[in-house]
């Protein structure tokens, strides 16, 4: 009830420090005081009625201050994206010059910050030793003694994304499909702006190409079931799908469901590096093949498939090509035109956006790609995904895509440095370790390691202050060895010894040091 009162009473009296403790609750120190804090700073709704909306810009500029109580006494402004990060002088020493790499492939060269540091590694050390955009202060992470390195399971919301979402969780609450008044128009525009941001991230051409869903699982189901059932109805002979043995579970389970409906599925085995051979795909295509689906970046071992050549092959053979890019979007450059991608699944919470929102890209081309809807109702999303759109989640998803477009190059340099740092340290200090998956064609924010003779689950339990995983979060409740590792030829015993480490935009050097030391 108190939270409802917060939304209702939106006028501020003491704007200066209104949300300090709320933002600082990430340290779990002020949670019990949040309601009291807000109720003391919100009073009436007069300001809301002036122009139909609160002056959110002034509200944030005056209230969202972060870090005034930090150990160095500095004040960081959440709205402007300025955050101080302090790196511990730990006991781990690796030659940083070795990892300087300014030639990383990316189509993003601009950075949305006011710092002179634009992502270049200089002689003083890696870029994240400077003042960079990072929501969590290094000293606070030390104080919490809890470190998150499970970024393939989910990522934290970027503060710029949260900032963009807040108005749509409070006073901009119209239904995007209410076409008769300002509230609906305002929400509809926000949704279309988010579509544009997603298109810009992947080089799409038309806003109608983006269909919002609840996440990558729904997007994958809609792509596979929607396409196969539609084209099979037109031609009963068309009933063949090609995929790989190392897809995400939601692809594999959807294919198994289609098999119960009479469809034929070919599961291709990758090589020992986790890469599917182009010749194997070519040899699997038959006259009755409808589509091929291959994961862009593998969620367990981080390997990047040869998506462009697969797309070209599918175009040449006149079959549809779908890719699950939930681990790739916002992290590696994607050009759906150049790569000839017909359908692509994305997820908000894998690129520093909110959970519960995803999208399916469907290319506009001639002849048009057709598919059957899975959810029926009011006809939203061009009739392919009925249901009221969650405007705040869509806005967050779109803003996350926009931020990724600006910062992908710098993020890639950061995670690549951490990957090489950990790899060199472990190789130097430990015997009997294996780095799984191709070490070249990969996303460097994902590291999968087998520690021979050490049970992976036991290792995770011994590192209880560091969040890691032994595989996909969707299957982590089982004690079975990773089916991905088994598919690339790793024995069951060794597969049981593997753990996955995930670096991200907000990973700090101190966290990486603690991982290595422990």
State each model region's role.
Residues 74, 105-106, 113-118:
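Intrinsically disordered, low-complexity regions enriched in glycine and serine
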Residues 1-73, 77-90:
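N-terminal mitochondrial targeting presequence
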Residues 3-11, 86, 119-518:
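Pyridoxal 5′-phosphate
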